[in-house]
């Protein structure tokens, strides 16, 4: 899911436990206006919502964390080292074996198993670190006590209450991150209502406990953001002697094409037409710049988290998982073969 830089999130998450929570004053005019809005727009009973907000806790430490200057982004070789560990790869293989059927089923949407695994591995270590805050506390705190982004978080609070009603959840029960991201794949409420899928067919979308729902929802999110079955995510490139004038590194848009990059002298091996959208990515390696070319599926991953580093880490972890655990052959309908960075070179 799109959210703040991972390292800034981690630092802020640690800080949120230092200040005590205080009861939210549900009689505040802004809270009462929100309750009236929910009643008018969506038919909620004001008295029932008032009882819910009477039990909500505002957390000043969350506001303090949001106000803290963003942590400097780590260079690629340090960022990658956080996610490409033996422990994370081994846990991913273990998860793949335990959840083979949910993975197989979700992959029928056209997203290979290793990418579904990799996103859950990067987001929450395969469900181990899904957050410890009540979602309603986090969202209400940011909706009513953090003016710079109050509009956004009031919208997410609205979506969360609708989600809770649709899924027959006690709105005081779900837990997640300090910013309100939920479950194993860390969906915000708007994303949950838009892209979460009932993968196991039980009538509910459970991103905390159902791996069928988790993997199907991640696959649906990526497909809805442009993922193309059978196409590569990214390949390594050689930019030695290439004309890189005018290229804006760090941008997420696919502003070039396979053909235009080759015309500049960038060397890479991929079986895509010259007209295929592409972006040249420069990463800070241990021995100097590393160049890669990202394609439409790379861009789809950046819709989950708007960072080239994030999408590159997901791609590398997916490749490592595929090497450590050979995904079983797909049953009908057949998914296209996985294309890794190394196999495309």
Stretches found by the model and what they are:
Residues 16-20:
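N-terminal signal peptide c-region/cleavage motif recognized by signal peptidases
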Residues 50-58, 112-127, 160-165, 218-219:
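Short, functionally critical alpha-helical segments immediately adjacent to catalytic or ligand/cofactor-binding
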Residues 81-94, 143-146, 150-151, 193-209, ...:
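Substrate-binding clefts and substrate-entry loops adjacent to catalytic sites
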Residues 30, 41, 237-345:
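C-terminal soluble interaction/assembly domains
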Residues 24-107:
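An acidic, Gly/Ser/Thr/Pro-rich helix-cap/linker signature
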């Amino acid at each position: 899911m799109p959210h703040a830089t991972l390292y800034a999130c981690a630092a802020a998450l640690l800080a949120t436990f230092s200040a005590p929570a205080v009861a939210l004053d549900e009689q505040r005019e802004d809270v009462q206006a929100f309750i009236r809005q929910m009643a008018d727009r969506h038919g909620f009973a004001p008295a029932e919502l008032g009882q819910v907000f009477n039990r909500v806790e505002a957390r000043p430490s969350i506001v303090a964390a949001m106000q803290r200057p963003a942590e400097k982004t780590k260079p690629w070789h340090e960022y990658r080292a956080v996610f490409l560990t033996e422990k994370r790869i081994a846990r991913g293989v273990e998860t793949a074996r335990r959840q083979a059927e949910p993975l197989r089923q979700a992959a029928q949407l056209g997203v290979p198993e290793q990418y579904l695994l990799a996103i859950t591995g990067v987001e929450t270590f395969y469900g181990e670190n899904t957050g410890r805050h009540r979602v309603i506390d986090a969202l209400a705190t940011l909706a009513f006590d953090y003016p710079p982004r109050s509009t956004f978080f009031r919208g997410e609070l609205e979506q969360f209450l609708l989600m809770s009603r649709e899924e027959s959840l006690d709105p005081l029960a779900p837990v997640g991150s300090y910013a309100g991201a939920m479950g194993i794949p860390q969906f915000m409420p708007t994303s949950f209502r838009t892209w979460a899928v009932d993968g196991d067919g039980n009538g509910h979308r459970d991103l905390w406990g159902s791996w069928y729902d988790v993997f199907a929802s991640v696959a649906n999110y990526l497909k809805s953001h442009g993922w193309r079955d059978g196409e590569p995510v990214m390949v390594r490139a050689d930019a030695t002697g290439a004309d890189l004038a005018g290229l804006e590194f760090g941008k997420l848009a696919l502003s070039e094409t396979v053909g235009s990059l080759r015309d500049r002298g960038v060397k890479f091996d991929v079986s895509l037409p010259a007209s295929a959208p592409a972006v040249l990515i420069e990463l800070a390696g241990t021995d100097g710049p590393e160049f890669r070319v990202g394609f439409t599926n790379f861009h789809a991953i950046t819709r989950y988290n708007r960072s080239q580093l994030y999408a590159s880490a997901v791609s590398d972890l997916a490749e490592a998982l595929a090497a450590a655990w050979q995904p079983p052959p797909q049953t009908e309908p057949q998914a296209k073969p996985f294309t890794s960075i190394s196999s495309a070179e």
